[in-house]
Amino acid sequence: SGYTECLKMGFKEHQINRVVPNKRYQLHGMNFETVPAYNVKSQYHPKSSNWVGYILEIRSASYYISGDTDMNEDNVLVECDVAFVPVGGIYTMDSVEAAKFVNEIQPRIVVPIHYGAIVGTKQDAERFEGLLRNTIECRIMM
């Protein structure tokens, strides 16, 4: 679990805050909400593991960091200004699936992630960008 991994890295128990899906939290003055992050077609990230993405509220904007996930019945309800969404495929959505997801939730800005190292390429990010509605700004960072 993430908790165990944090302990192995040297964090103390009092430094670790456990979260569960579908909850709102406030930590050190920051408000955030957890969103279930899981795969629908594969079992790399099963729903039963209770992994999450986050919606952070910073100033007057909301930022969704999806985590390793596919489009699913939980995250399709996300409302945000900026979304960070995986496009690399295999362990997460591929570029086509990610574009379908982002076109559904309609953030103002999207940043494709989870490509270019382990899986996926810059071409995946570019393909993703080409499939977005013209009302959604895409920022490819690498």
Regions found by a protein language model. Name each.
Residues 1-2, 64-67, 83-88, 110-114, ...:
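Active-site neighborhood of phospho(di)ester-bond hydrolases with catalytic His/Asp-centered motifs
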Residues 1-17, 79-84, 106:
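Active-site metal-binding motif and surrounding structural segment of the metallo-beta-lactamase
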Residues 7-11, 26-31, 43-45, 92-99, ...:
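Short, charged, surface-exposed secondary-structure boundary motifs
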Residues 39, 88-90, 115-119:
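Short histidine/acidic/glycine/proline-rich micro-motifs that form metal-
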